[in-house]
Amino acid sequence: MNANPKFLSADAHVDEAAVAPLPNSRKVYVTGSRADIRVPMREISQADTPDSFGGEKNPPVYVYDTSGPYSDPEAKIDIRAGLPALRQAWIEERGDTEALTGLSSDFSRERAADTATADLRFKGLHRTPRRAIAGKNVSQMHYARKGIITPEMEYIAIRENQRRAEYLESLKTSGPNGEKLAAMMGRQHPGQAFGASAFGPNGLTAITPEFVREEVARGRAIIPNNINHPESEPMIIGRNFLVKVNANIGNSAVTSSIGEEVDKMTWAIRWGGDTVMDLSTGKHIHETREWIIRNSPVPIGTVPIYQALEKVNGKAEDLTWEIFRDTLIEQAEQGVDYFTIHAGVRLQYVPLTAKRMTGIVSRGGSIMAKWCLAHHKESFLYEHFEDICEIMKAYDVAFSLGDGLRPGSIYDANDEAQLGELKTLGELTQIAWKHDVQTMIEGPGHVPMQLIKENMDLQLEWCDEAPFYTLGPLTTDIAPGYDHITSGIGAAMIGWFGTAMLCYVTPKEHLGLPNKDDVKTGIITYKLAAHAADLAKGHPGAQVRDNALSKARFEFRWEDQFNLGLDPDKAREFHDETLPKDSAKVAHFCSMCGPHFCSMKITQDVREFAAQQGVTDDEALKKGMEVKSIEFMKKGAEIYQRQ
C-alpha cells in the first residue's frame, strides 16, 4: 500500500462532504458545571406549522451528535495537526499520570527511526505519551469505585439526555396550546426492558452524572477513553444507556490507503458511528492508526493480534507473549481506547469446532486456535491475562473480550464451542474487574431469531451484566449483498434484549472491503436498529424524534420530514425523483397516492369539515358518510361509473 499523495500534501483535508453541516442543522454546545465541559449536539430547526393546521411554532429538536468538530463551521479542520486535546486538562489535573520521556515500545522506537516511513508519519503531535504513575490506576472504573464523578461522567450524562427537558419546556411556551403540545410530543409508549434498571414505571426520567458513575462502578457500562486519546469526546456503552453503533474500517494487503481510511472514519462518524474499529491488516498499520486516532473524536478500537501477526510474517505459531505485550504498549501509547483480545479461545474448545458447518470464522480466533494447536497449550493471552490487565489500567484501555469462536453460520449458532468460550469470558471479566479494568464482551455472529434471546440471557448471567457488543447477529445466510439487512433484524432484537453496542455490517459483508457508500449504508441501517431498540426498551426521550417527524409528516412539512430523518439526503433524493419542483415541498400529497387519495389529506378535510359544522371528528365522519351515501344512490348505485 502506498500513501495517498493528496492526503500527505501540505493542504491535505478531509472530504468536503464529510464536514458540511446536515440540512437545517447546526452544532450547539451545552455547558456543564465547568466551562471546559462543552457537550456537542445537533440542533435540527423546524418550520412553523401552516396556518391551515393551527399555525404553531415547532421548536428545534436536539439529537446525539458523533461528528466531532467536523460538522462545526467555526472549527478549523486540519488533519495534519489533528483535533484539539479536549480532555488533556482533565487527565493532567488528576495528578496520577506522567508524561514519558520517550516511547516505551521497542517497535514504536524502531518505527520512529525508520527513514523509509518518514513521509507517512503523522507529524502534528507535539506531546509525549502518558502513563499511570507507578502503583496508580487511571481507569474510569477505578475512579467510579472510589466515588469520584469525573468530568467525563458529567459530560456523558448531559450528552445522553439530548436536551429533552429543554425541548419540552420550549414546547410549553410555544403558544396558547403549549402545554397540550408538550404532552403530545413528550408522549412515549411504555417499554419492555427485560430487567434493565433504568427503564420502566419506576425508572429514570433523565440520566444523571451519579447514575453514570454507579453503572461504571458496577461494570454494567464502560467509558472507553485512553489517556493518550484526549481528542475523544466522552461516551458510554451500557444497557441502561442509548444503544451505540460501531463502524469497522481498515486497510488490507491489497487495497486502500491511509487517506481513504481517515476519510472513512470521518464519514462514519458523520452518519452516527459512536466508535470506530481500525482492523487494518496491510502495510503501515502503525502509521494508519496514528492518523486515525489523532483525527478521531470517537473511541478507537483495534485487534492487536492482527499487527502482532504482521510482525512474525503471518506465522501464527511464531507469536510470543513478548511480541504481543510490546504491541499492546505500542497501541496504548498511541491512544487506542479498547482492545479486542481473544483470551477465551482455550485449547479444550478448539476440537469442538470440528463439528461445525463453517468452523472458526473469527480471524483473531483462528490465529489463536492455530497457536494453541501448534504448541498444544493454553494461549499466552489466557495465561498472561493478569499481565494484560496491568497494561490496560496504566492507560485506561478497555477490554473488548473477543468471541473468537462465534458462529459463522446459523447452522453453528449457540453450539458448545461458542457457549463454552462465553462462559470463559465471564470468568475473565471477573479478573479484569478485580483490577478495575473496564470490560465489554463481544458476541455473535450468525443466529436465527428464535435463538437470539438465549444468547443475551446467557451473557447477562455468565458475564454479570458486563456490556454486550455484538456483530449483528445475522438472522439468515441466504442474502449475500444484503447482509446489512439480515443482520439489522438481529441487531434490533438483541439491542432490545440488552446489547449495549452493535457492530455494523455493510452490504459488502462476506464479499469485499467496504467503500464510503457501504460505510454509510451500514451505519444508517444500524442507527435504525439501535433506535428501534431504544424505543422498545422505553429509553427516556427515545420517542421525541419520532413524534416530531410524524407531526411534520401529518402537516406536510416536507423539508422537516427530510431533515429529522437519519439520512436527509436520501429522503430528499427519493422525493425529488418524482416530485422535483420546489412547489412539491409544500404540497399536501406525495407521489405515492397523489392529491386525491392521500390519507392524511383526507383526515385534514374531515377536521376542517368538523370545525365548519361545529361537531367532533367522529360526528363529521358520520355526516360525511351519509352525504356520500346519498350521492352514490343518486348516481345509480353502480360501483364503476362513467366520468
Curated annotation (Swiss-Prot):
Cofactor notes: Binds 1 [4Fe-4S] cluster per subunit. The cluster is coordinated with 3 cysteines and an exchangeable S-adenosyl-L-methionine.
Entry-linked Pfam families: ThiC-associated, ThiC_Rad_SAM
Residues annotated to bind substrate: 248, 277, 306, 342, 362-364, 403-406, 442, 469
Protein's pathway: Cofactor biosynthesis; thiamine diphosphate biosynthesis
InterPro entries named among the record's database cross-references: ThiC, ThiC-associated_dom, ThiC/Bza_core_dom, ThiC/BzaA/B
Function: Catalyzes the synthesis of the hydroxymethylpyrimidine phosphate (HMP-P) moiety of thiamine from aminoimidazole ribotide (AIR) in a radical S-adenosyl-L-methionine (SAM)-dependent reaction.
Family: Belongs to the ThiC family.
Full protein name: Phosphomethylpyrimidine synthase
Gene source species: Paraburkholderia phytofirmans (strain DSM 17436 / LMG 22146 / PsJN) (Burkholderia phytofirmans)
Lineage summary: Bacteria, Pseudomonadati, Pseudomonadota, Betaproteobacteria, Burkholderiales
